[in-house]
Curated annotation (Swiss-Prot):
SUPFAM superfamilies: PFL-like glycyl radical enzymes. InterPro entries: UPF0210. It holds the Pfam family DUF711. Homodimer. It comes from the Bacteria. This is UPF0210 protein SSU05_0296. Belongs to the UPF0210 family. The lineage of its organism: Bacteria, Bacillati, Bacillota, Bacilli, Lactobacillales.
Length: 445
């Protein structure tokens, strides 16, 4: 590495808010299954604190050694619905408490995997877990939850969609922060390092390390140098910048897996914003020539950004995965917040952008009076985009306050303006239940 590259890396960290967003250790809990829920909870706690006891120390050590901030150290586990199903318990709160206790013990930021995979129907554990979510998130501080309700191969479980509309409402009523730690997916991935949607897939190794990077500020600074140039130049600039960002992610992942003695999984090629000025995906899109995010051209700008990030990132590491794209959470991105406040960005435009971006309707506050069926219909729309386009989509909606209020979450979760929601009813549509069949192009065999 020559002196120019060293200087570039220092600038990325000091001036452009570059960091490693997360080192996430995925841990399989399949060997913790027990017919007694208290015994299962004890096994879960023991395995997590044994496998991840050095995660925080190693993360801090690497950060100090390289001079690169590693913002979060996290753990993801096997979907708890699979562990709980072996018991006769009527709720899975003991397992949620075991996860939270383990997370506090090892000093991590979040633990994901209070999850269910219900894309084609409910097994016993799925329904129990889903109904446990509101209290599980209210009674814990570090546990994150997710439910997969659809996939391109199976279609959309509309019964689960209906139930999740209700659960999101109940979760927001049980605790202010609960709904911010709950994601509803279509086409959920098994190696996602980002919260709140991370869980450790059943096809994964026993323990793996996955890395998520963050660098919208770096991309924006690079684009400032090519103002007025053609889109060919813009795409190439983003690609080269994404390569540099991801290369550092690969290095950190290799070092962490080596020192922890576990397998290295993937680098997630996502641009993840924070509420800090200079760390915004929205401002990257505006740098391409948009007056404000939400105006016409926004979806095209996002498409270019997403694709170029992937092309550059793939060259930089041997295993990529997770969600891999650009995140567009409202509360976690100061540019998105500004666009909502000035009226240029609404829910309908956000939905269009989710056909392109890394996930979906993310960290969006809506009025607390919004009916559960309307929330379920938002989930159904997002799931349809994901299922038809063979991509991951998700909903992390927070029904709090009234339209125009500002909801303060703090930290990386930021601040969310409460957005206007269409008032027309979707009740009869949602109450049908059943399964929307898989699309015709899903039959590949």
């Amino acid at each position: 590495m020559d002196i120019r590259q060293v200087r570039e890396t220092i600038e990325m960290i000091e001036e452009q808010n570059f960091d490693i967003r997360t080192i996430t250790m995925g841990i399989s809990l399949l060997d913790c299954i027990d017919s007694d829920i208290d015994k299962a909870a004890e096994k879960v706690y023991t395995k997590i604190v044994t496998k991840a006891k050095n995660l925080v120390a190693v993360g801090d050590e690497i950060a100090a050694e390289l001079g690169i901030p590693i913002v979060n150290k996290r753990v993801s586990v096997t979907p708890i619905a699979l562990i709980g199903a072996a018991t006769d318990a009527t709720d899975y709160l003991p397992l949620a408490h075991a996860l939270d206790k383990a997370a506090h013990e090892i000093g991590i930021d979040f633990i994901g995997g209070f999850s269910a995979l219900a894309q084609k129907g409910y097994q016993k554990g799925d329904e129990i877990l889903i109904n446990s979510i509101p209290q599980a998130l209210a009674q814990t501080s570090k546990v994150c939850s997710s439910v997969n309700i659809g996939s391109t191969k199976t279609g959309i479980n509309m019964t689960a969609v209906r139930d999740m509309g209700r659960i999101i409402k109940e979760t927001a009523e049980a605790s202010d922060m609960g709904a911010a730690k709950l994601v509803v997916f279509a086409n959920a991935v098994e190696d996602n390092p980002f919260m709140a949607g991370a869980f450790h897939g059943v096809g994964e190794a026993d323990v793996v390390i996955n890395v998520g990077v963050s660098g919208p500020g770096v991309v924006k600074r690079a684009l400032e140098k090519v103002r007025g140039e053609s889109f060919d130049v813009v795409a190439e600039t983003v690609k080269k910048t994404a390569f540099k960002i991801t290369r550092i992610g690969q290095l950190v992942g290799n070092m962490a897996s080596e020192r922890l003695g576990v397998k290295f999984g993937i680098v997630d090629l996502s641009l993840a914003p924070t509420p800090a000025v200079g760390d915004s995906v929205a401002r990257v899109l505006e740098e391409m020539g948009l007056e404000t995010v939400g105006t016409h051209g926004t979806t095209a700008a996002l498409a270019l950004l997403n694709d170029a990030v992937k092309k550059g990132g793939v060259m930089a590491c041997n295993q990529v995965g997770g969600l891999s794209g650009a995140f567009i959470p409202v509360s976690e991105d100061e540019g998105m917040i500004a666009a909502v406040q000035n009226g240029s960005l609404n829910l309908e435009k956000l939905e269009a952008m989710t056909a392109i971006c890394s996930v979906g309707l993310d960290m969006i506050a809506i009025p607390e009076t919004t009916p559960a069926e309307t929330i379920a219909a938002m989930i159904a729309d997002e799931a349809a985009i994901g299922v038809i386009n063979q991509k991951t989509t998700a909903v992390r909606i927070i029904p709090l306050g009234k339209e125009g209020d500002m909801i303060e979450f703090g930290g990386l979760l930021g601040t969310a303006p409460v957005m206007k929601v269409n008032q027309a009813s979707s009740v009869d549509f949602i109450n049908r239940g059943g399964q929307i069949p898989a699309p015709i192009h899903s039959f590949k065999n």
